[in-house]
């Protein structure tokens, strides 16, 4: 995707972000129009599950009832004492100003 080597989306210079996502949009349309696909799933891995150490994305063609099960939720139920609000606060504190 980007010609300049970057590993993570957060490493991509801000001026290149629009071009990256315009390219993603073009690829998504081509996959959905060129293949028998009802839709698609767009996936970017950062470090974990990143197959190559270079920013790239996957456009996965999808069809209703295609059998692909992809769920980002937990493999177990959340505990009622889940620290979601504490995590949200830590993320808000780490979020850089726009």
Q: Positions of the model-derived regions?
A:
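HIT superfamily nucleotide-processing domains
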Residues: 1-98
């Amino acid at each position: 995707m980007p010609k300049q080597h970057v590993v993570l989306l957060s490493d991509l210079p801000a001026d290149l972000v629009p071009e990256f996502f315009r390219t993603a949009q073009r690829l998504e349309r081509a996959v959905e129009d060129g293949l028998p696909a009802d839709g698609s799933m767009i996936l970017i891995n950062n470090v974990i599950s990143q197959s190559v150490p270079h920013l790239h994305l996957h456009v996965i063609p999808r069809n209703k009832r295609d059998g692909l099960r992809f769920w980002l939720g937990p493999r177990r139920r959340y505990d009622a004492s889940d620290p979601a609000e504490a995590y949200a606060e830590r993320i808000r504190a780490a979020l850089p100003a726009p």
